[in-house]
Design a protein with these regions (language model features):
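ATP-binding Walker
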Residues: 100, 112-113
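Conserved P-loop
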Residues: 115-164, 168-170
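Hydrophobic anchor at the beta1->P-loop junction of P-loop NTPases
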Residues: 106
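Phosphate-binding/switch loop-helix module in NTP-utilizing enzymes
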Residues: 169-227, 293
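P-loop (Walker A) phosphate-binding loop of NTP-binding proteins
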Residues: 109
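Haloarchaeal acidic low-complexity proteome signature biased toward cell-envelope/secretome components but also
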Residues: 1-89, 310
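Conserved P-loop NTPase
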Residues: 171, 190-192, 265-310
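Pre-Walker A adenine-sensing motif
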Residues: 87-97
Length: 310
């Protein structure tokens, strides 16, 4: 079962998520060649308007002080199960880790490492033997796998072992069919047994809606369904042009449980620019309020939690 076109004859994406077929096959970012957005991880996809191929599935800066925490650690001792983000230094800024099943967001401008952050977040789960789903609205499946390989992360092997699904979706088609995709994605999360999920980037989805109220309601409904599915989810978002501390449309920071801000910071002498991360909020967790420098290296993001920016 599952042969032929993975999305059935009525693929609403016109082949844009896979490598073939429909009139809009040049759409934004499907897989190259085989047309299987899950990297081979699929069962029999029933042809039809309400099944999108998710069905029947059988993831030395200047020395500074240690992170400052605002509250008594005992205040946050509870039965909440927590997990690390998977980024060196950043995890040390979060006391005990983020609560599992949280909805997280990372906000940043171009070149701040949002996709690297997301891949590293997912890699943490995969290397721990868990499963993950990566949904990209702006790249192909192959480019995501290539980027992970360049960082030394075994995403292709995880996909071959049916522990990782990388799905490339055209943002226009996603916006047009969001309620159906939302329902099928929730089913995929459950049947795939995903522990973590990434949506890169929610900004492209937001851009598909012209009316602010429609944009808010659609994004809210989508993120709420992810929250209710029980998977720990990370959304990437472009920063506002006006301030690095807000997302482009000012929505995701209010819908998510945790917000990480990535930005370029320029020194007072204007001669040096550094990358800096700040934890804007984490519900049910104590965390550092300091802004800390980080680098994007050939092995991922490293945060210097013991250092000052300049």
């Amino acid at each position: 079962s599952g042969g032929g076109r993975p999305f059935g004859a009525d693929d609403p994406f016109g082949g844009s998520r896979g490598g073939g077929g429909g009139p809009s096959g040049a759409g934004g970012g499907g897989t190259e060649g085989g047309g299987d957005p899950f990297g081979g991880y699929r069962g029999a996809a029933t042809a039809g308007d309400d099944d999108f191929g998710f069905g029947d599935l059988g993831g030395d800066a200047d020395a500074g002080g240690p992170p400052d925490f605002d509250a008594d650690p005992d205040e946050f001792e509870s039965e909440i199960t927590r997990t690390d983000i998977g980024i060196e230094g950043l995890d040390d800024m979060i006391l005990g880790g983020v609560p599992k099943r949280s909805l997280l967001s990372v906000i940043g401008g171009a070149g701040t490492g949002k996709t690297t952050f997301a891949l590293q977040f997912l890699n943490r789960a995969l290397e721990s033997g868990n499963r993950g789903i990566y949904i990209t609205l702006e790249q192909t499946r192959e480019s995501i796998l290539d980027t992970a390989t360049e960082k030394g992360w075994s995403f292709r092997e995880h996909a071959d072992e049916d522990r990782l699904a990388v799905v490339a979706i055209d943002p226009i088609e996603m916006a047009n069919s969001l309620s159906s995709i939302r329902n099928d994605l929730v089913r995929l999360i459950s049947e795939f047994g995903a522990d973590r999920l990434v949506l890169d980037s929610v900004s492209l989805l937001e851009m598909m809606y012209d009316h602010p109220a429609k944009r808010r309601s659609e994004v809210f409904g989508f993120t709420r369904s992810l929250k209710e599915s029980g998977v720990t989810t990370l959304l990437t978002s472009e920063a506002s042009e006006d301030t690095p501390y807000a997302s482009r449309h000012g929505i995701v920071e209010y819908l998510t449980d945790a917000v990480f801000v990535l930005q370029y910071v320029r020194g007072s002498d204007f001669r040096e620019t550094r990358l800096a991360v700040e934890i804007q909020k984490i519900r049910d967790a104590n965390h550092s309020r300091e802004t800390k420098p980080y680098d994007i290296t050939d092995t991922g993001i490293s945060v210097y939690d013991q250092a000052n920016i300049f």
